[in-house]
Amino acid sequence: MFDSVAAELHRDGHHVEAVTLSGLESDGPVDVDRPPNLDTHIDQVTEIIDRGDGTPVALCGHSYGGMVIAGVADRLSDRLDQLVFIDAYVPDDGDSCWSLTSDSFRELFIAGARADGRWVVVPEGLDPRARPHPLPSFVQSIRIGGTLSRALGRTFISGGAWPGSPFVTLTERLRNDSAWRVHEIPVGHNIARRDPHSLAAVLGALLPDSA
């Protein structure tokens, strides 16, 4: 989904790694009987950054991915200079995707996992590359033990007030928080697919001191 965004950023001289979270591989999960949870995904991204060369990272997460990058930042805030939530959940300690989302999405999760209780099937109309999502990652609460550095840039990129968005109230709250920068690309939730050029432009313009 982020291939076009990554390609534009590469052309502008940025190093980009688009991570496919465990269980969402294009050819299916490694072990369908053991769906990964939120901790699995936080561990995965943490390990990728640990293997890097130490250059400060701008860490981006879309939708559920906001849960993941918040968990990584709690562990590796000294390795990051930016957190970018792309129409994404922004958790506090003890929150989960389940607790932060709307009733309609909770119903969607349960209905989608009815077949096996493990994987949430892809709703009709989504990107054809989308894969069933592991239910445990939606319901596990995040554990955030520290306080993020005020020097860490925090950006929220809103897709606008699309029908059913669980992010409208969050967006307005962050607009009034001086620790955050808020951008709007009003094309709906799937910003990377619908307007990759605008998303790449916002990401490419982020500065290390933009807290």
Residue ranges of model-derived segments:
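Active-site nucleophile elbow and catalytic-triad environment of alpha/beta-hydrolase enzymes
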Residues: 128-146
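Short beta-strand/loop motif that positions the catalytic acidic residue
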Residues: 150, 156-158
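Gly/Ala-rich beta-loop-alpha elbow adjacent to hydrolase catalytic centers
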Residues: 60-65, 69
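Residue in the alpha/beta-hydrolase core beta-strand immediately N-terminal to the catalytic nucleophile
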Residues: 20, 58, 81-84
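Flexible "cap/lid" loop of the alpha/beta hydrolase fold
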Residues: 74-114, 137, 165-172
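Active-site loop/oxyanion-hole signature of alpha/beta-hydrolase fold enzymes
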Residues: 15, 21-57, 74, 102
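Conserved loop-alpha-helix segment in the C-terminal half of the alpha/beta-hydrolase fold
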Residues: 160-186, 190-193, 198, 205-206
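Short, surface-exposed "cap/lid" segments of acyl-processing enzymes
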Residues: 1-21
